[in-house]
Regions:
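Short alpha-helical segment that forms part of, or immediately flanks, the ligand-binding pocket
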Residues: 5, 27-32, 43-47
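Aromatic "clamp/platform" in nucleotide-sugar-dependent glycosyltransferases that forms part
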Residues: 19
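Conserved donor-nucleotide binding/catalytic region of nucleotide-linked donor-dependent transferases
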Residues: 70-90
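C-terminal alpha-helical cap of glycosyltransferases
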Residues: 69, 92-111
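Short alpha-helical donor nucleotide-sugar binding micro-motif in glycosyltransferases
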Residues: 1, 6-11
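Conserved acidic donor-binding segment of nucleotide-sugar-dependent glycosyltransferases
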Residues: 54-61, 71-75
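Short hydrophobic beta-strand element within catalytic cores of glycosyltransferases
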Residues: 13, 32, 36-39
Length: 111
C-alpha cells in the first residue's frame, strides 16, 4: 500500500479501467492526492467522481488510448503543470468540503 501511494503521488494522472467496483479506494486515494483520474464509466465511478475525473467507455480500448494520450499531452504543457502536480493539502481540503456538503444534504432530508 505504501508503494502504491508513493507511485500515485508521483504520477501525472491515474487510470482506473475497472469493469466492476464496490467502492473504489484507488479513486478515493487519488482524490486525497488531488490527482487527475481517468475512470471507466461505470455506476460507482459516476457516483464517486469529482471535477478532476474523466470518464471513458470501459469497453472501448481505442477511446481509452485516446483519452490517455490527450491527458498525457495536456499534462506535459507548462500552463497545466499545477493541475497535474497534485496537492495533498488541497485534496484533503476538498474531501472535507465534500463531506460538509454531504452532511448538509443529509440534514435537509432527515431533519
Amino acid at each position: 500500500r505504501t508503494e502504491q501511494l508513493a507511485i500515485m503521488k508521483n504520477a501525472q494522472f491515474i487510470v482506473q479501467p475497472s469493469l466492476c467496483e464496490g467502492w473504489g479506494t484507488v479513486l478515493e486515494d487519488a482524490k486525497v492526492l488531488n490527482k487527475v483520474v481517468l475512470l471507466s464509466n461505470i455506476p460507482v465511478h459516476q457516483e464517486q467522481q469529482n471535477k478532476k475525473c474523466v470518464l471513458f467507455d470501459p469497453h472501448d480500448p481505442k477511446q481509452l488510448a485516446e483519452t490517455i494520450a490527450r491527458t498525457a499531452e495536456r499534462a506535459s504543457l507548462p500552463e497545466h503543470e499545477a493541475e497535474y502536480a497534485g496537492d495533498m493539502e488541497q485534496g484533503i481540503a476538498n474531501m472535507y468540503r465534500e463531506a460538509r456538503e454531504y452532511s448538509r444534504a443529509l440534514e435537509r432530508v432527515f431533519l
